[in-house]
Amino acid sequence: MGIKVYNTLTRKKEELKPLRDGEVRMYVCGPTVYDYPHLGHARTYIAFDVIRRYLEHRGFTVLMVMNFTDIDDKIIKRAQETGEDPGKLAERFIKVFLEDMNALKVKPADIYPRVTEHIDDIIEFIKKLKEKGYAYEGSDGVYFEVQKFKDYGKLSGVKIEELRKGARVEPGEGKKNPEDFALWKKAKPGEPKWDSPWGEGRPGWHIECSVMSSKYLGESFDIHGGGNDLIFPHHENEIAQSEACFGHEWVRYWLHTGFVMVKGEKMSKSLGNFVTVRELLQRYSPEVIRLFVLQKHYRSPLDYTEEGLQHAKNNLERLYNTLENIRIAMRNAELSYKWSEKDFEAYEAIREARKKFYDAMDDDFNTAEALKAVFEVSNAINKYILEVDKPKESILRKALEFFKVVSEVFGIFEDYFKEEKKGEEEKLIELLVEVRKQLRKEKRFDLADKIREELRKLGIQLEDKGQETVWKRVKVS
């Protein structure tokens, strides 16, 4: 049984069958860069980061493209408000976006194309649409004639008749029909502009993604993703202009993330009910934010509450405590010559939970269900460590290997597992613990306390239990 994805286009789950064997080509709509990213944006990019990570974990080569819309009405408006050059404004917020995604441990896309660097490609694409009879020039720009594309509405279910009643269409003086949308906007005074066969101007919003995705992923590719709010009009219009140009199916699977909700309303800039990524990172670690997002399936609405974030923080601490318990137990572990009933119980619990994890992720990347399996392993291994005098090294390693998979797929615990010289570090820590133990015996408590304090600064906490001392890693605040 392979990976199943929910395809917005067909409104059902389908087995993922990439166009090229062993490779998934994926395009995710990137930001319009005029302001700081908020949690609603982060939710989408964390979700697609985990989807990509899981596909790579399952052995696929993933080619991922994410665009930057660096010229747009919103950018021009913000630049006019601030007196900043639109290009410099966009450049500044591209840097902000990349910094925020890096802080959230979102892996970089393979290619980040920008609209302003693909103007010639966009012009060529529009020329093809005109040649094929799908586009026309009006007084204020070039438009796509929606009624010429017979499959319009197949993604969103919207009907042309409804659009003609004035629902969710952009204004335009030169349109033939209300539903038609701009491919090229003729220049207005003071706006950025480029030469074209239709006079100076700039691209419309929808044409950008069709051009840039196809340039790097081909005229047909596997996955196109974004937030639910992009289904109409953006993705619907992308399909229309792309399939009109190429004459065949453009994208095989359409994936969309649910909204982040605040007291029953969508988190958005327009409502002013948003919290920026930077504000969140002042209060919570990147891993807490990732875990908060992953506690819900990517297609489900995600309620933003402080209680929810605190719950994620507590859960993350539980998992880190489990990792430390395993590490400490490894010191006392023994090789397996014979298994007891409790050994078998622990092994079976890990095996069953591991299967549940993969089953959940194979079922449209259901991170909420997969996390339940993670906590099943956590509970089982903690119980095992408490109940046996000498845990079996092989069982502890199986639990640790499972958590490494979780780290790889969910983007948590990465620093914990990245320490290449961990073995040497542990030997040095053990040596310092022994030196401190001797100092305490000699009642040289000032030096013993100095070692404890210096180790604490490095994230190593010592706990004295009678004559013995146990150490564990902690987050340095």
UniProtKB/Swiss-Prot annotation:
<dbReference type="GO" id="GO:0005524">
    <property type="term" value="F:ATP binding"/>
</dbReference>
<keyword id="KW-0436">Ligase</keyword>
<keyword id="KW-0067">ATP-binding</keyword>
<feature type="binding site">
    <location>
        <position position="29"/>
    </location>
    <ligand>
        <name>Zn(2+)</name>
    </ligand>
</feature>
<feature type="binding site">
    <location>
        <position position="234"/>
    </location>
    <ligand>
        <name>Zn(2+)</name>
    </ligand>
</feature>
<dbReference type="Pfam" id="PF09190">
    <property type="entry name" value="DALR_2"/>
</dbReference>
<protein>
    <recommendedName>
        <fullName>Cysteine--tRNA ligase</fullName>
        <ecNumber>6.1.1.16</ecNumber>
    </recommendedName>
</protein>
<dbReference type="GO" id="GO:0006423">
    <property type="term" value="P:cysteinyl-tRNA aminoacylation"/>
</dbReference>
<keyword id="KW-0479">Metal-binding</keyword>
<dbReference type="GO" id="GO:0004817">
    <property type="term" value="F:cysteine-tRNA ligase activity"/>
</dbReference>
<dbReference type="InterPro" id="IPR024909">
    <property type="entry name" value="Cys-tRNA/MSH_ligase"/>
</dbReference>
<keyword id="KW-0963">Cytoplasm</keyword>
<dbReference type="InterPro" id="IPR015803">
    <property type="entry name" value="Cys-tRNA-ligase"/>
</dbReference>
<feature type="binding site">
    <location>
        <position position="209"/>
    </location>
    <ligand>
        <name>Zn(2+)</name>
    </ligand>
</feature>
<keyword id="KW-0648">Protein biosynthesis</keyword>
<keyword id="KW-0862">Zinc</keyword>
<dbReference type="GO" id="GO:0008270">
    <property type="term" value="F:zinc ion binding"/>
</dbReference>
<feature type="binding site">
    <location>
        <position position="269"/>
    </location>
    <ligand>
        <name>ATP</name>
    </ligand>
</feature>
<feature type="short sequence motif" description="'HIGH' region">
    <location>
        <begin position="31"/>
        <end position="41"/>
    </location>
</feature>
<dbReference type="GO" id="GO:0005737">
    <property type="term" value="C:cytoplasm"/>
</dbReference>
<feature type="binding site">
    <location>
        <position position="238"/>
    </location>
    <ligand>
        <name>Zn(2+)</name>
    </ligand>
</feature>
<comment type="similarity">
    <text>Belongs to the class-I aminoacyl-tRNA synthetase family.</text>
</comment>
<dbReference type="InterPro" id="IPR015273">
    <property type="entry name" value="Cys-tRNA-synt_Ia_DALR"/>
</dbReference>
<keyword id="KW-0030">Aminoacyl-tRNA synthetase</keyword>
<dbReference type="InterPro" id="IPR009080">
    <property type="entry name" value="tRNAsynth_Ia_anticodon-bd"/>
</dbReference>
<dbReference type="InterPro" id="IPR014729">
    <property type="entry name" value="Rossmann-like_a/b/a_fold"/>
</dbReference>
<feature type="short sequence motif" description="'KMSKS' region">
    <location>
        <begin position="266"/>
        <end position="270"/>
    </location>
</feature>
<keyword id="KW-0547">Nucleotide-binding</keyword>
<dbReference type="InterPro" id="IPR032678">
    <property type="entry name" value="tRNA-synt_1_cat_dom"/>
</dbReference>
<dbReference type="Pfam" id="PF01406">
    <property type="entry name" value="tRNA-synt_1e"/>
</dbReference>
